[in-house]
UniProtKB/Swiss-Prot annotation:
Protein's name in the database: 4-hydroxy-3-methylbut-2-enyl diphosphate reductase
Segments passing through the bilayer: none
Lineage of producing organism: Bacteria, Bacillati, Bacillota, Bacilli, Bacillales
The protein's annotated pathway: Isoprenoid biosynthesis; dimethylallyl diphosphate biosynthesis; dimethylallyl diphosphate from (2E)-4-hydroxy-3-methylbutenyl diphosphate: step 1/1; Isoprenoid biosynthesis; isopentenyl diphosphate biosynthesis via DXP pathway; isopentenyl diphosphate from 1-deoxy-D-xylulose 5-phosphate: step 6/6
Single GO MF descriptor: metal ion binding
Length: 316
């Protein structure tokens, strides 16, 4: 069986930066304890499990404000997905120490929304409902930001001005965003468009679109909560025309997927640890459908190998 290792794949700079920020926090003895992450620092359970070994507690809930209600003291890390001004204010009121690990691409979208609100615009924001990134973006200006996920959401959308900006969640499928923007243009012809698919998401989607078409099957390594990982599987099926499955790690691969398959493409979401992806590739490279000794699918990557290394600061 031939393995097509789609490139680029895996970690983006925003994810690595967020994890380094959190690791440095774990090593900083001057920070008030306990240290919490407000939601998953990135959408990957292997990463959050590894941070728990570092002594950092991940709390999750229906919204960032709901999670904050569970915290009365210590340090709070805001995730790469960004948070609303209300969340920052609530943390300040509670006397919590805060560390912001928001991805710079997300911050850029927040700044854009603030600027357009000051100019009297309303904003149509294309994103996934119940995902933390849209929650933070809508929270920048909830009175003028309208979240839509699909074309049906446009049917009941009414905006009391011709000054409309359209932007989006950074990890959406660029093809889905383009189609929705075309629909929005028809209903709101005066709308201005500012596509905010981050470069890492864009190039990974384009790589799948161009490289997965030679494969019989695509395996996307990524957490079920990872929107960008789920979108890679979608791109493989809808753009490259190749059946795709998303797996959290090697243990989720089903042997029946591989029956009659000669070429398997492998990619990974932007929040997927590299050792987890390498383990999937290693399994596929040694797999022999005629040899049961090659069928074992057990994740063996230790949590200590999941997080990026950071330098321990020496005391002066």
């Amino acid at each position: 069986m031939k393995i097509v290792k789609i490139s680029p794949r895996g970690y983006c700079y925003g994810v690595v930066d967020a994890m380094v920020i959190a690791r440095n926090a774990a090593l900083d003895t001057s920070l008030p304890r306990p240290i919490y992450i407000l939601g998953m620092i990135v959408h990957n359970k292997h990463v959050t499990d590894a941070f728990e070994e570092d002594g950092i507690i991940t709390l999750d809930g229906p919204s960032r404000l709901d999670i904050l209600d569970k915290i009365d003291s210590g340090t709070v890390i805001f995730t790469a997905h960004g948070v609303s001004p209300e969340v920052k204010q609530r943390a300040k009121e509670k006397g919590l120490t805060t560390i912001d690990a928001t991805c710079p691409d997300v911050t850029k979208t927040h700044d854009l929304i603030e600027a357009k609100k000051a100019e009297g615009y309303h904003v149509i924001y294309i994103g996934k409902k119940n995902h933390p990134e849209p929650e933070g973006a809508v929270g920048i200006a909830p009175d003028i930001v309208h979240l839509i996920e699909r074309a049906d959401d446009l049917k009941t959308l009414e905006i009391p001005t011709d000054k409309i900006l359209v932007t989006n969640q950074t990890t959406m499928s660029q093809w889905d965003v383009q189609h929705l923007m075309e629909d929005i243009q028809k209903k709101f012809p005066t709308a201005e468009f500012h596509k905010e698919i981050c470069l890492a998401t864009q190039v990974r989607q384009e790589a799948v679109a161009k490289q997965a078409d030679v494969a019989d099957l695509t395996i996307v390594v990524g957490d079920p909560k990872s929107n960008n990982s789920n979108r890679l599987a979608q791109v493989s099926q809808e753009i490259a025309g190749t059946k795709a499955y998303r797996v959290a790690d090697v243990s989720e691969i089903k042997l029946e997927w591989l029956q009659g398959v000669e070429n398997v493409a492998v990619t990974a979401g932007a929040s997927t640890p590299t050792p987890i992806t390498k383990e999937v590739i290693a399994f596929l490279e040694q797999y022999d459908p005629m040899n049961p000794a090659t069928w074992e699918r057990v994740r063996k990557v230790p949590l200590q190998k999941i997080l990026p290394r950071v330098k321990v600061k020496k005391e002066q």
